[in-house]
């Protein structure tokens, strides 16, 4: 049983030769520790040493002709409360007029190549879709929460644009990737203090 078959069996509720294993998505500070332990800076070799069954292959596919980011939050700092482009927005028209990402700028060539050469591992993929994080970055966390009450229509409009882009991006990606992927990797949480 190879890595891919193992996780497919586990997810289907069928017997497998052992428990599945995924190292996860280590923090950048962890990789030097692992590299030192295993004596290599080749992350794939490290994953093989762990006998890791899965490779999370994310589409890094947005190529704006002017090299703009997929979502241009225009944040004023790194902290969660740092205001973004909509920190002071009170108009749905302003939200709609924003330069939202265009799915026509997606190019899945490199992602498809990575999926094709991933080997016998289980391959979850797709756009991760951290909607709440992205929307919070557009406002700043505190502004986001306040505007949910004071300007709910503005928050809904930003959320709609973010979600609609991800839906279309994933629709296009799944149409191209087909059975090269085993599962959709969806990650999102809305944790507060």
What are these model-predicted stretches?
Residues 1-193:
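Catalytic cores of TIM-barrel enzymes
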């Amino acid at each position: 049983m190879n890595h891919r078959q193992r996780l497919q069996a586990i997810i289907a509720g069928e017997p497998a030769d052992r428990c599945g294993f995924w190292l996860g998505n280590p923090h950048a500070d962890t990789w030097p520790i692992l590299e030192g332990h295993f004596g290599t800076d080749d992350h794939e070799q490290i994953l093989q040493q762990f006998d890791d069954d899965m490779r999370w292959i994310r589409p890094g596919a947005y190529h704006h002709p002017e090299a703009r980011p997929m979502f241009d939050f225009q944040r004023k700092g790194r902290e969660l409360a740092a205001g973004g482009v909509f920190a002071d927005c009170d108009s749905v028209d302003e939200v709609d007029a924003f330069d939202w990402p265009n799915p026509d700028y997606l190019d899945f060539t490199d992602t498809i190549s990575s999926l094709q050469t991933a080997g016998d591992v289980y391959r979850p993929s797709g756009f991760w879709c951290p909607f709440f994080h992205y929307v919070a970055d557009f406002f700043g966390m505190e502004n986001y929460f306040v505007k949910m009450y004071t300007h709910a229509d503005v928050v809904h409009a930003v959320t709609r644009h973010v979600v609609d882009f991800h839906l279309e991006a994933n629709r296009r990606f799944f149409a191209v990737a087909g059975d090269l992927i085993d599962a959709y990797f969806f990650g999102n949480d809305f944790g507060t203090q």
